[in-house]
Amino acid sequence: KVQIYADVAIGVSNILKKYDLLNAYEYATALKEYNGISFADDEMEAYKNGSKGIDWQNLMLQTGISQDYKLGISGGTAKNKYLISANVLNMTAMTITTKYQRAQLRINLDNELTKWLTLSTKINASRTHSHNGGIDIMNFLNYSPTMEMKDPVTGVYNMDPYNSVNGNPYGARVA
């Protein structure tokens, strides 16, 4: 008897609560008050009206989605049995730097050649692709909201000039 099965699972993940962080204007004001770092008046105005500055949480966080698809067929006779199944998994995390994909194929064949001899074949194949930019949430939460994202001349992602030794988290995102 032939049996066919299919299964689909979809999942969604989201951060429950974002951190209450300083915006670019508040951060620039704090740098000026506590470290004596001064910004030009037009720059401060741009931070204040929101036309300049980086909201790292809005930039780096997304809704994570998981999609898992399974399909299989099995059957046979009393002496010959088979099972063939396939699985595709696609996951994007809550951070834009992380993604995981996997495809699997499985084949099982059992053939009873005699009462005392059965030939079994089992084949498993899998292909996996993962991207983890090495960025945890604290990396981008500590990045300055007042920095320029890229060097305008080279196009290279800038490092935070004030308080992080880690690379620019946006540069590690999944393309």
Please identify what each model-predicted range represents.
Residues 1-5, 66-68, 81, 87-89:
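A beta-strand signature from Gram-negative outer-membrane beta-barrel systems
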Residues 58-60:
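C-terminal beta-signal and adjacent terminal beta-strands/loops
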Residues 3-53, 63, 93-100, 104, ...:
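Surface-exposed loop/interface segments of Gram-negative outer-membrane beta-barrel transport/assembly proteins
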Residues 40-44, 76-81:
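Short hydrophobic/aromatic-rich motifs at helix boundaries and adjacent loops
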Residues 66, 77-78, 114:
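Outer-membrane beta-barrel channels and translocator barrels
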Residues 69-75:
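Structured alpha-helical segments in the cores of large, soluble enzyme domains
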